[in-house]
């Protein structure tokens, strides 16, 4: 019976191995689909938001009262006219940034923060709008560290650039849309070298849920759609020194399991700033996978044992 037992054992091992390989193959395909969905959703949501902001800005650019106030550099009049506009588009369209900028890129008015003005703006989006004389847009970091999807338009009157109009949607709002649409959690970790700590802490002091600078050694988690970072991801961020490109892995903590998809996050200049980390809860699927594996092992063992007994008593 030893040759038969050996053959049965090999058969069981082969059957279980095929099951495991097939399960892992399906899992890899599922992760790849999720990763592709995240990247596609990010592009599509950004494109939709850009089109939305452009449509609103093109209406604002037609307002003769605003044009007159901008030409006169009348900050108070611009604020009076623009505050109701910002309140409306913030409530309806998630637009939180609204700027009037002079032709030399000096900030004339931040409608959302009217006491802060007079600084020179060197953001890439605005520089490109100035250089090309055309609208330009993209995700870009602000002076206080937040990332915003920005759109900048030259304000042209009688062939003359009298200033620039810029609007923006917080990056976190885009992440929230991805979370809601794909049923995932999203974390954005940015290398600390891209931040001014004093400005970061100034901005965080105003937040309902401030992000502590010392939470992790090398990165700050700028955006998070989950109130608590899972322990394995916190350990990952704690050990993170540099970005390593796109990758996927699985984590488990507190009887939960999640697919983890890491996508490099870059700015408009092509600088790799950090990582977009997406978590998809697969706790139920992982439990089904374990039950399936246990079932395959049990069935294979029972069938193999039954055949051995059959041939033994034959």
Where are the regions a protein language model picked out?
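Conserved beta-strands of PAS-like sensory domains
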Residues: 146-180, 259-261, 266, 271-288
């Amino acid at each position: 019976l030893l040759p038969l037992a050996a053959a049965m054992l090999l058969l069981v091992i082969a059957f279980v191995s095929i099951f495991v390989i097939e399960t892992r193959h399906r899992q890899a395909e599922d992760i790849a689909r999720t990763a592709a969905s995240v990247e596609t959703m990010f592009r599509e949501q950004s494109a939709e938001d850009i089109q939305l902001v452009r449509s609103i800005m093109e209406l604002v650019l037609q307002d003769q009262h605003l044009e007159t106030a901008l030409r006169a550099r009348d900050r108070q009049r611009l604020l009076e006219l623009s505050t109701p506009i910002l309140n409306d588009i913030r409530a309806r369209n998630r637009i939180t940034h609204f700027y009037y900028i002079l032709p030399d890129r000096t900030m004339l008015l931040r409608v959302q923060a009217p006491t802060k003005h007079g600084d020179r703006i060197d953001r890439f989006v605005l520089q490109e709008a100035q250089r090309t004389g055309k609208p330009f847009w993209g995700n870009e970091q602000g002076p206080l560290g937040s990332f915003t999807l920005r759109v900048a338009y030259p304000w042209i009157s009688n062939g003359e650039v009298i200033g620039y109009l810029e609007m923006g949607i917080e990056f976190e709002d885009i992440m929230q849309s991805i979370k809601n649409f794909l049923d995932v959690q999203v974390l954005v970790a940015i290398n600390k070298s891209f931040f001014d700590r004093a400005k970061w802490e100034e901005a965080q002091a105003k937040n309902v849920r401030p992000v502590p600078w010392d939470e992790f050694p090398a990165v700050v988690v700028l955006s998070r759609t989950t109130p608590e970072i899972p322990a394995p991801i916190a350990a990952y961020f704690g050990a993170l020194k540099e970005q390593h490109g796109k990758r996927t892995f699985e984590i488990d903590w507190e009887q939960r399991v999640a697919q983890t998809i890491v996508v490099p996050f870059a700015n408009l200049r092509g600088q790799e700033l950090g990582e977009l980390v997406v978590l998809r809860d697969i706790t139920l699927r992982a439990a089904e996978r374990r039950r399936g594996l246990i079932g395959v092992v049990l069935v294979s063992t029972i069938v193999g044992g039954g055949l051995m007994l059959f041939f033994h008593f034959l």
